[in-house]
Design a protein with these regions (language model features):
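Residue-level signature of transmembrane alpha-helical entry/exit and packing/kink sites
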Residues: 187, 235-236, 301, 334-338
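Cytosolic catalytic headpiece
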Residues: 1-104, 110-114, 156, 178, ...
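Hydrophobic alpha-helical transmembrane segments in multi-pass integral membrane proteins
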Residues: 173, 246-248, 307-323
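Cytoplasmic-side transmembrane-helix entry/capping segments in multi-pass membrane proteins
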Residues: 292-301
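Short, Lys/Arg-enriched, Gly/Pro-containing loop segments at transmembrane-helix junctions
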Residues: 212-219, 290-292, 356-361
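Alpha-helical transmembrane segments of multi-pass membrane proteins
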Residues: 194-198, 271-279, 308-315, 341-349
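Membrane-embedded transport module
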Residues: 46-98, 112, 117-287
Length: 361
């Protein structure tokens, strides 16, 4: 007899999809027994239950809505019936990704939350009606797309959290000296230098960040979930606030301790740069500590951090840099103080990560 074996990649892809909280439903024109046999081979859940195309024609939409909550196999189904299945899933609040390749699949592909057409054997009509076209017609590619999408979402969220956090101390140190009637800490060229660190950090460092180990073990987000939630905004704000408190303390202790204006400014600004770099390292992951995050390679991170430290050295120790930024050179002890203060400003969030992970597990 003839045999059309399942692709080797499909069972593992189905398992990974289940781990990511994605339900997999098989809609086929095959006979029920054939469909159930394939379902068992690929590891589909609940292969005992099925609905045939004839049954689908006989049951009402309300009954279909109830039965589709547990049935994952639809056999002897014609393309026109896919639209009913999509509508039943969507009426239950599901986000539906539908695959198809034929002309008659177009209505279901268009109605689904995400239409996925086959690029190899799919028709032009199916491709036009879809949101995504699979070049290799492989189910594994769909799971890989989910992984990439979650990584991009994570990295956007991290970049936005970092942007909010880093601008809190910048805004604070621009305003507070005016209120206290002390010399200005941040002059225009200081803010420009900070932005030269912030922009590549957001556009390059977080973009190049690898996905976290548990990215395909998380439940899917709902369509109502915000990219930048209140919880994320609150944590980011407190990251920035803690940096502001520490940097302001360094400035006030230095200035009222009798240091010159240029020395106080250099000390405060260097602390802010170290804290800024700390925020970049810290926001690479909200579940792994800084030291564990270093296990994940990101060459761009080291270019940005190295460049920032190099140019910080230039403006601290070369005469033209000192004149331009109104700095005086710092001693080795001063640098250690700035480094310690910068690390102290982000320490609480590292502790939060540890306790948060313990709570989750």
């Amino acid at each position: 007899g003839l045999m059309d074996p399942v692709r080797d990649s499909v069972p593992s892809a189905v398992k990974e999809a289940y781990g990511a909280g994605i339900r997999v439903i098989m809609i086929t024109g095959d006979y029920p027994n054939t469909a159930q046999n394939i379902a068992r081979q690929i590891g589909l859940k609940n292969p005992e239950e099925r609905i045939t195309g004839d049954e689908l024609d006989k049951i009402s939409d309300e009954e279909l809505k109830e039965r589709i909550k547990t049935v994952n196999i639809f056999s002897r189904v014609v393309p026109e019936q896919k639209l009913r299945i999509v509508n039943a899933l969507k009426s239950n609040g599901e986000v539906v990704a539908m695959t198809g390749d034929g002309v008659n699949d177009a209505p279901a592909l268009k109605t689904a939350s995400i239409g996925i057409a086959m690029g190899g054997r799919g028709t032009d009509v199916a491709r036009e009606a879809s949101d995504i076209v699979l070049l290799d017609d492989d189910f594994l590619s769909i799971v890989q797309v989910v992984r990439v999408g979650r990584r991009i979402y994570d990295n956007l969220k991290k970049a936005m959290a970092y942007i909010l956090a880093v601008h809190v101390p910048i805004a604070g140190m621009s305003l507070i000296p005016v209120i206290l009637k002390t010399p200005l800490v941040l002059l225009p060229m200081h803010i420009v230098f900070l932005e030269l660190v912030i922009d590549p950090a957001c556009s390059l460092v977080f973009e190049a960040e690898k996905e976290e180990a548990d990215i395909m073990e998380r439940p899917p987000r709902t369509s109502e979930d915000s990219l930048f939630s209140r919880k994320t905004a609150t944590i980011s704000f407190f990251q920035g606030l803690s940096v502001l408190v520490v940097v302001l303390a360094v400035f006030l202790m230095s200035y009222y301790g009798g240091d010159s204006e240029t020395h106080s400014r250099a000390l405060t600004y260097t602390t802010l740069i170290f804290a800024n770099l700390g925020l970049i390292f810290m926001n690479r992951s909200w579940s792994r500590t800084i030291f564990r995050s270093l296990e994940l390679p990101n060459r761009t991170l080291w270019y940005v951090a190295g460049g920032a430290l190099f140019f910080l050295g230039v403006i601290l120790y070369l005469p033209f840099g000192q004149n331009l930024f109104k700095f005086s050179p710092l001693s080795f002890t001063d640098i250690l103080l700035c480094l310690g203060a910068g690390f102290l400003s982000i320490l609480w969030f590292e502790v939060w990560k540890i306790f948060h992970q313990r709570h989750l597990h």
